[in-house]
């Protein structure tokens, strides 16, 4: 039986295409928030964002944040790199479905066995019981945020 993943209004699924050439960018050693040192002004290495964030494409999802329930940590249109091969830990942010509901982004509280929104304006939390069907799409591994508006 084919199972379709349904997201709620706070998430949008983005497919990952892994074919094609990788692009590399030069990484400079650190960025000082104070006064820079001339000794630190050298090239470090080249990286591929594919290799950093898509090292296991078969276990990686990208979701776009919609809504404000996880603000201020997550903003509208942020991209989440979600890994389905990570074991969920206390305090992780997860994409999850409870009792066949739409998938949503929430923080996991292992101690109190609940999922909750971090925005204080969204007091909604879900207590998880033994009877609940919990389907974890994955754990948020990284966040991509555009700082400038697209032209």
Locate the predicted segments by residue.
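Short, surface-exposed beta-strand-loop junctions and turns on beta-sheet-rich folds
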Residues: 41, 45, 102, 121-124
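Short, compositionally biased
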Residues: 68-71, 92-114
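Short, hydrophobic/aromatic-rich segments at coil-to-beta transitions
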Residues: 60, 89-93
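Short, positionally conserved secondary-structure boundary motifs
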Residues: 1-64, 69, 142-151
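Short, well-ordered loop/turn sites that connect or cap secondary structure elements
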Residues: 74, 86-88
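Glycine- and charge-enriched low-complexity intrinsically disordered segments
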Residues: 110-151
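Structural motif
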Residues: 78-79, 92
């Amino acid at each position: 039986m084919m199972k379709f993943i349904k997201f709620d209004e706070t998430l949008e699924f983005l497919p990952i295409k892994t074919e094609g050439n990788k692009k590399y960018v030069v990484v400079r050693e650190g960025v000082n928030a104070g006064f820079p040192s001339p000794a630190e002004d050298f090239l470090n290495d080249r990286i591929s964002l594919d290799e950093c964030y898509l090292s296991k494409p078969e276990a990686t999802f990208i979701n776009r944040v919609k809504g404000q329930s996880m603000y201020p940590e997550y903003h509208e249109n942020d991209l989440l790199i979600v890994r389905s091969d990570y074991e969920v830990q206390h305090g992780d942010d997860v994409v999850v479905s409870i009792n066949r509901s739409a998938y949503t982004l929430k923080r996991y509280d292992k101690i109190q066995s609940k999922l909750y929104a971090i925005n204080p304006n969204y007091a909604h939390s879900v207590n998880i019981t033994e009877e609940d069907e919990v389907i974890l799409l994955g754990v948020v591994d990284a966040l991509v945020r555009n700082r400038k508006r697209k032209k």
